[in-house]
Amino acid sequence: MTKRIGILTGGGDAPGLNPAIKYIVKKASQVGYETFGITDGWKGLLEPGIEKITDLGSDLQKRLEVSAMELIKNRIHEFEWKDLVKNARLSIAPLSKSDVSKWGKKPGTNLGSSRTNPFAKGNDRSKILIENIEKLGLDYIVALGGEDTQTVGYRLSDLGKNVIGIPKTIDGDLPGTDYTLGFRTAVGVIKKNVEIADGTARSHNQTTVVETMGRHSGLLAYEGAHSTNVGMVLIPEYSPSLEEIKTILMRRKEQGVSYDIILVSEGTKIRDYEDRSSAAKGDEFGHVKFDHVGQLLASDLEDLTDQKIRSISLGHLLRGADPNGYDIDMANHFGVAAVELIEKGISGRMISYSDGKITHVPLSRAI
């Protein structure tokens, strides 16, 4: 019996998403399932235009053909699947093997993403979400994302809808799995950029503070530090004082270290700093934008030590890199495993990598 699968990506992009989508579609095609791409995460299932879609088959195909002709007429000869879909004023469309054939090594997510929370306090749109899933006749949703995306998946599953999760976050800190898509590639980006910063720091006998992502976990910065030459790593799990950091820095100078690299996670809380992020307005999941801790730290240390100290924020560079071989392989395993669960009629699970094996855990474990 054929099944209709909707695929979406939520939250921040990460290396490995496009390959995972490709392998979901490829495996689903092999077993005779229909696959549909949902644009911009959960937002794509809340779009008002969905109610105008009467047929996910021939009706949609006609609209996409017209959209392609319009783009070509406007001399836009190179366009992605999402461009085609958006131009047709759609938020969901068929996703075939040919559509995703070149997605295997591409960075980001060609489906688009957002931080939309259908269950947001004060703006609960879960009823619309469920109605649209039913209108579209989607038997399963495969949601690729981190804690927020999996939380929505869990709540949707709890309401009786079939959801399979695939873990993604470059922070590498999602519960229920030993690996999340994008982590290894992001560590490689840290290594490459720290090596570049190291050359300049050495040339000018200066200290450089390199800020990485890592809201609640320092795993990314920690692994990045182990892959390259840094003098100090600061992570959210420990809140140092400026005085402690200054003491270590000065001690290294006394030991003959002429320059230094300090790696700091964005979520690190320096005890001397007021938590300026707490009063800021957050996204639909309540996440606020952090102050630039690396920049603040560099400025304060320069005043305290009378040394030349610079700062670099790697920020979104960590998300946007081409996936490395490891992330492509894991994307393959995760994507195939998701469809295999669907074949067995299993739902409410997240694909997991644990003890060296691909397995799955309840979505409740990922939140």
Identify the meaning behind each predicted range:
Residues 1-81:
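N-terminal phosphate-binding or glycine-rich loops at protein starts, especially the Walker A/P-loop
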Residues 10-13, 38-44, 115-116, 146-149, ...:
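Short, ordered loop/turn segments at secondary-structure junctions
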Residues 16, 163-204, 208:
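Phosphate/pyrophosphate-binding betaalpha-module
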Residues 14-24, 45-46, 119-127, 138, ...:
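Short glycine/serine/threonine-rich phosphate/pyrophosphate-binding segments
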Residues 285, 289-367:
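C-terminal non-catalytic interaction/assembly regions of soluble proteins
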Residues 52-141, 181-192:
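Glycine-rich oxoanion-binding loops at beta->alpha junctions
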Residues 35, 132, 140-145, 153-155, ...:
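Accessory alpha-helical/coil subdomains and C-terminal extensions
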